[in-house]
């Protein structure tokens, strides 16, 4: 039996999962990581805590599975994207807190770029919108605000990276300073056409090239873990950003295949093959993966509020005590009776990108109950995904045959059925919902010879349930119209 170790470093926790070659889980370990918000719009984590939590769960998972590091065939890594870490190469110590992808402190810098007419240029080069979401603005802020950092960077003594870079640096005890291609594509610094750092953008952003890591393919043999770290060395042979890892783990290898991950937010990725497709509908173009000497691209739509809506029902309104109770509450009514929730608590993501939009709950009457609100909350998740898919299909002129789903909220049968109904597309839920971690493990296994091709990985994907569309066309159109009207009222230009 071949064991594969997946490291899944997310926004709220560090995890380690041990799989076999069939995708069966043999051990899981998890440790939460703290998030700090020292100022309005700032979101940070302790980079050293990220590393210490990750090494701790590796050791815990090995102990739980009753195996040794020498029994692991390969290590795969997946991570929260865009999050930015800088450190001193000489000491290996972080020079500042990790700036998390949700952080908005670079908003003014981004606005200045937009005012200077760089929006189209940045999209054509990187596939991304100018937004504080991406790493470039975070790095510029650090260079301008951390005392002595720019000098260290120009002297070649400082390093920048995303979370994959930081973990690999520590796993190899400073031997490797790299960034994997799908992660690099989220920095707003990599040219998607050349798959190299864009010198023109670096000059315009005043970022020293000496600070940047080497871009490597998703299936590169990076190095072995350092001697003495885990008892025996383990080859690091697969790295992917978390959403790209989920696309790979869902075996969405064919052009036109798509997955949607239901977590705190929603992230839909649509495989566009080896062709760069630049969106005309405010979606992101991203690198899906590089493996077996081939590059695959994707269109991505990011929705800010999904599982977070259920958390609001629990913590903000007190309608439920536990998130899992939302389906039971919502099922007490057959419809929302006209109640619509637009969950723009932090603005609207793709394809609207309206940071000033505000949440709206409308259509209520004296007969409205908490069950109607709970049902409207679940439907709001599906409506937002529908907006993303509509934009994707407009860009690609290609109908979606099926949508593969994962993430915690995909276990909600009511939500998945409504998602299928409102999309008019079958929704497929796999038996194993750890698609992100499995994607990293499978990529590592492909390089390590556990798998010889993508078909062998695809064979491990097993269906749990298909949710077929049941809603009549006129009802679907009516519901989408209700959503559209509520959305217009929530957007900033109408408040």
Curated annotation (Swiss-Prot):
Catalytic activity field: glycerol + ATP = sn-glycerol 3-phosphate + ADP + H(+)
GO MF: ATP binding; glycerol kinase activity
InterPro entries: ATPase_NBD (IPR043129), Carb_kinase_FGGY (IPR000577), Carb_kinase_FGGY_CS (IPR018483), FGGY_C (IPR018485), FGGY_N (IPR018484), Glycerol_kin (IPR005999)
Record: residues binding ATP: 11-13, 264, 307, 311, 408
Cystine connections: none
Activity regulation summary: Inhibited by fructose 1,6-bisphosphate (FBP).
Binding, sn-glycerol 3-phosphate: 11, 81-82, 133, 242
GO biological process: glycerol catabolic process; glycerol metabolic process; glycerol-3-phosphate metabolic process
Its EC number(s): 2.7.1.30
Protein known as: Glycerol kinase
Lineage of origin: Bacteria, Pseudomonadati, Pseudomonadota, Gammaproteobacteria, Moraxellales
